[in-house]
Amino acid sequence: MQYSIKQILSNANDKLNKIGINLPGLEARILLQHVTNKPIEHLLIKLNEQLSEAEIEAFEKLLERRLAHEPIAYIIGVKEFYSREFIVNKHVLIPRIDTEVLVDVVIGLVVSRNNLHMFSKLKSLDSVLTTQSYNILELGTGSGCIAISLLCELPNTNIIATDISVDAIKVAKSNSIKYNVTDRIQIIHSNWFEKLDKQKFDFIVSNPPYISHTEKLKMAIETINYEPSIALFAEEDGLEAYSIIAKNAKQFLKPNGKIILEIGFSQAAKVSKIFLNYGYNIDYIYRDLQSHNRVIEISPINLNRSYARRIGKSLSKMQQKLLDNELPKYLFSKEKFKSEKRKVFLEIGFGMGEHLINQAKINPDTLFIGVEVYLNGVANVLKHSAQHNITNFLLFPNNLDLILNDLPNNSLDGIYILFPDPWIKNKKKKKRIFNKERLKILQNKLKNNGNLVFASDIENYFYEAMALIRQNGNFEIIHNDDYLQPHDNYIITKYHQKAINANRTAKFMILQHALTDH
């Protein structure tokens, strides 16, 4: 018996709708397009056209599979990703549009690096993308959609892609042949880094398994029953892969290398904690189209590592939630800062953030940038800023030297360095915030007549810092009452109160940057 396109589509739409498929009409058309090999436009225009018995039989078989909740991508054997169709089957994760953010980030970083010295001489984005070659490692390539998209967009790039699944590797190789990139990709059967030589890479990228087993019951039937669990679920509350990458990645990165990873939308704080504790910087957290945290950009601290602890006592659930949801809004970046027109003050090592929050509250038209690697303190600032509706601040929970690289010269109206660790033992003094080289950098960041405030409750450290400033800095002391009088709007912090209770006297050095050329 023959049926028209309209009858077939209507019947399929009703059946798919009955089992809760979100877009039943569209999926019915996709299945029929796959069977007839005719464009959807043709199917919509020729609704009264009769289908052959063979076409109807083939369509019904595919529809039965979809009614059993098999993903449509597996049924038709392809899935679009980054404007290209990739071969997929039950051995690989189905590409998601959220993962395209990861590809965007890597391309953006390549463009940014090439722009540093070439953009003014180039005429097109294509020229920027082909200027310099890059070596990329992808961990857990699956279908190869990430690696192959990068190869297609970045012609001078070479990639090594690994996967633990032999069947997934076959799919990735088929896609590399489809897009004619086999000469620039090496696909290796490896469990993470195990089979790699000691090659160095510009970027390590991965969309690792990150779903905890406890979330399984909340997931769609078609995902649980059909997609490979090894590509979805991870131990350690979904964080196992991030720990493996954090532990091993440094030895495979070039000096300026980056790690770009997809994360679950509620995992930013937990993943950040893992990498911070392994000696990395969290450079940026990117959001997807639904404004969920989706991709994290990471770089090793190397010789510029911070000596402070990243975590004091364990983060509470509330603190983790604040770091996940609020920190990305207030995370310092060059992009956020470059168009800044307000007065700007930098506080280095803000501790629990009492001073930073108070200054921001009293001076709503001024931007305050806080640097602190201690995540409990960062979470405390986010908590109190939300309670008091304070938004005129940015946070940098990383090493000081990294933000100094991103701040333009002559951009700061003031710098606060309040009660930094004195590192009293001689062999530890190299860890102090102040040294000759960093002092020069700090004064260059200050505007002419900008202020630097230094405070310490350790008398020897205070006067050693003063001697260093007098010998190497272009500053004038603008306040002197035996250095006991703090700057305007100062509040006694918990640390300062502890010093008072211990009979230690806090001294404040208030300096003005003398007129000089930058």
Swiss-Prot record:
Chain residue ranges for the region called HemK: 1-300
Enzyme Commission numbers on file: 2.1.1.297, 2.1.1.33
CDD domains for the chain: AdoMet_MTases
Ligase is among the record's keywords: no
Pfam families, per the entry: Methyltransf_4 (PF02390), MTS (PF05175), PrmC_N (PF17827)
MF term (GO), any: protein-glutamine N-methyltransferase activity
Disulfide bridges in this chain: none
Region (RF MTase): 1-302
Catalysis performed (reactions): L-glutaminyl-[peptide chain release factor] + S-adenosyl-L-methionine = N(5)-methyl-L-glutaminyl-[peptide chain release factor] + S-adenosyl-L-homocysteine + H(+); guanosine(46) in tRNA + S-adenosyl-L-methionine = N(7)-methylguanosine(46) in tRNA + S-adenosyl-L-homocysteine
Active site: D421
Similarity section: In the C-terminal section; belongs to the class I-like SAM-binding methyltransferase superfamily. TrmB family. In the N-terminal section; belongs to the protein N5-glutamine methyltransferase family. PrmC subfamily.
Name this protein carries in UniProt: Bifunctional methyltransferase
Species of provenance: Rickettsia prowazekii (strain Madrid E)
Gene from which the chain derives: prmC/trmB
